[in-house]
Amino acid sequence: MAPVITITSDELRDRVEEHLGHWIPDSLWERSEPYARRKLDLCRERNPEIDYYNDEYLVLLTADTVRETAFSDYTLAACEAIMAARSQ
């Protein structure tokens, strides 16, 4: 059975920023953290026998989510810029 997740939001953010090697903007963090926590909760519900779904796993999962969200923001902004340029 997986251990209880005990890491606070501030601790998680500090560890994710350390893992990524850079500061995370608030707007990006506010979307990424809840998504990663929800994703881990779903994994834990589906596979309760897995014992490595712990705080460290949440750090890695959240770091991936931050990267994915930032990339999504970038591609959406690029698409909007291309579409705006085409309409002129």
Q: What role is predicted for each listed range?
A:
Residues A2-F71, T75:
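N-terminal segment of the canonical double-stranded RNA-binding domain
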Residues A70-Q88:
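Ampiphathic alpha-helical segments that act as solvent-exposed interaction surfaces
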